[in-house]
A protein has these predicted regions:
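Outer-membrane beta-barrel porins/channels
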Residues: 1-291
Length: 291
């Protein structure tokens, strides 16, 4: 610490459109039984996105900046300031495309009389095969008067995605109990496996537009997510009221920037991770009336 101060600001806004295709089947293995099995496939969501970002970093104070030892072009070792004082910032506008992963899933459901319903779903998504795409041109359709943009895969970013992300499994189980015809009690649990590999990191050295336009360096290596839900539903003639509570919990390791390793260990900069918890409580209510 050198006695100086800093403050920072960052704002990111992403807008766009996307589309996907879903297909599935449901069948009953035994015609006389309410037990059913389902399967589905979900195509990637094909996003066309626009990013607008801004950031500013200010360094100020009455002391000289801290220094570190480094070699100059002539090989002489000297003290080099860790930073320069003043305001440094930039604004970024960038258009790109992103294809999310393919997803497949299977489900099972069963009912007991008219008072109990049980369900379970397993889904797998190939997050390590997302396709980051760069807009690299286009053409004009003179007949229709429209301009169509073309894009190609960002090979460097996609290689980094495969190195740091992995397939994600999602398990959902739930039950609904109807003690009376007017009242429903609901319980559920979701488990989502980690998207990030154990030693995943945000690589700021790859040759990709996604790195060139970045306005921050921090990242969080999130672990598995658990969701617990419960709810109650009330129906009376044409009126229905539903109240649901959901608790989501997830742990992660926060890093301010990636590790930088130098041949001279004294010049290496390896940050210490910080354990973080992302716990969220949600209460939802829906009121409906049938006319």
């Amino acid at each position: 610490m050198d006695g100086n101060y800093s403050d920072s600001y960052e704002e990111i806004r992403i807008t766009g459109t996307g589309y996907d295709v879903k297909a599935g089947v449901i069948f009953r293995p035994v015609e006389e039984s309410p037990f059913r099995i389902g399967a589905y496939v979900n195509s990637p969501v094909f996003y066309d996105l626009s990013l607008s970002a801004a950031h500013d970093l200010s360094m100020y104070g009455g002391e000289a900046p801290a220094t570190f030892q480094d070699k100059d072009a002539a090989g002489n070792i000297g003290n080099v300031p860790c930073y320069t004082k003043g305001d440094k910032g930039q604004t970024v506008d960038y258009d790109f495309r992103l294809n999310t992963p393919w997803k497949v899933g299977v489900s099972m459901g069963h009912t007991v009389g008219n008072y109990l319903a049980l369900g379970a779903t397993y889904e797998y998504a190939w997050y390590d095969h997302m396709d980051n795409r760069v807009k690299d041109g286009g053409y004009y359709d003179y007949y229709w008067g429209d301009y169509y943009e073309s894009s190609s895969s960002d090979d460097a970013m996609n290689a980094d995605t495969r190195a740091n992300l992995k397939g994600v499994s999602t398990l959902k189980v739930g039950a609904e109990i109807k003690p009376t015809s007017m009242l429903s009690l609901r319980f559920g649990y979701n488990y989502v496996s980690p998207m990030f590999r154990e030693n995943a990191y945000r690589d700021q050295s790859i040759g990709s537009n996604g790195v060139d336009i970045a306005t921050s360096t921090d990242y969080t290596n999130w672990k598995a997510m658990n969701r617990f839900t419960c709810g109650v539903g009330f129906n009376y003639e044409n009126l229905n009221i539903d109240v649901a509570y959901q608790y989501t919990t997830q742990k992660g390791d926060f890093y301010p920037f990636m590790s930088y390793v130098n041949e001279n260990a004294a010049l290496s900069n390896i940050p210490t991770s910080c354990k973080v918890d992302n716990n969220r409580h949600q209460l939802l209510m829906t009121v409906g009336y049938k006319f």
